[in-house]
């Protein structure tokens, strides 16, 4: 993925950040590696905003789960919140916003495919949420988060933190036995920087695919996407 050529004002308009807060958005898109490799640049990177955005995200998702699922215990709410805001879901949301194209990365991260790394994308999304909160307050942040995580919130009862494959299997087999299989459909990159694409099939039909730096990561992402797709089909 190449860096977006345009000023982040375009992204700011899309996500609801005021024009006078563009500097905050730029900070949210600045990875620490860029600052370390460019000492002449402004010293701020996105880690503090990531901290703030993580707190805002946790609050909003917790609030939504509390209201939508009134019979859940504290433990159930905590587990499902962790599942909704897991790295895979955060990275998926960042990809839908095409945040990777807007990131400022150091040369090393750029060369190693940093614009596609789930951890970097997840951190950037949290930082952007922090920027939205500072620009527009909790209501603006809530609108953004609920819109971006709407599918995950609607399907929260079927999510299990850390193991999408198990959760998907349990969800599918509620309606009876099913043959669930995962296969690697694409593999690219040098040995030190592999990328895998996995597909998940139910009874021979491809439901979703996912990608990752390991086969396991790709399969987990495929399962997470498949849960949302399967829930939509059965809903």
Curated annotation (Swiss-Prot):
Its EC number is 3.1.26.3. Its cofactor is Mg(2+). One of its GO terms (cellular component) is cytoplasm. The keyword Transit peptide does not apply. Pfam families: dsrm (PF00035), Ribonucleas_3_3 (PF14622). Keywords: Cytoplasm, Endonuclease, Hydrolase, Magnesium, Metal-binding, mRNA processing, Nuclease, RNA-binding, rRNA processing, rRNA-binding, tRNA processing. SMART domains: DSRM, RIBOc. This is Ribonuclease 3. The lineage of its organism: Bacteria, Bacillati, Bacillota, Clostridia, Eubacteriales.
């Amino acid at each position: 993925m190449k860096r977006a050529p345009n000023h982040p004002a375009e992204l700011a308009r899309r996500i609801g950040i005021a024009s006078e807060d563009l500097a905050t958005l730029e900070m949210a898109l600045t990875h620490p590696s860029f600052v370390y490799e460019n000492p002449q640049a402004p010293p701020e990177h996105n880690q503090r905003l990531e901290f703030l955005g993580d707190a805002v995200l946790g609050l909003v998702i917790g609030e939504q789960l509390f209201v939508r699922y009134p019979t859940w215990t504290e433990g159930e709410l905590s587990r499902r919140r962790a599942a909704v805001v897991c790295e895979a879901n955060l990275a998926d949301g960042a990809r839908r916003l095409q945040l990777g194209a807007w990131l400022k990365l150091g040369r090393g991260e750029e060369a190693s495919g940093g614009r596609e790394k789930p951890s970097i994308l997840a951190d950037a999304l949290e930082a952007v949420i922090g920027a939205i909160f500072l620009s527009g307050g909790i209501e603006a942040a809530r609108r953004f988060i609920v819109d971006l995580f709407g599918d995950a919130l609607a399907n929260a009862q079927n999510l299990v933190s850390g193991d999408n494959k198990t959760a998907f299997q349990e969800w599918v087999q509620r309606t009876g036995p099913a043959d669930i299989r995962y296969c690697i459909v694409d593999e690219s990159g040098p040995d030190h920087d592999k990328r895998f694409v996995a597909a998940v099939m139910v009874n021979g039909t491809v439901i979703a695919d996912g990608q990752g730096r390991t086969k396991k990561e790709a399969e987990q992402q495929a399962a997470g996407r498949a849960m949302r797709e399967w829930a939509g089909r059965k809903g």
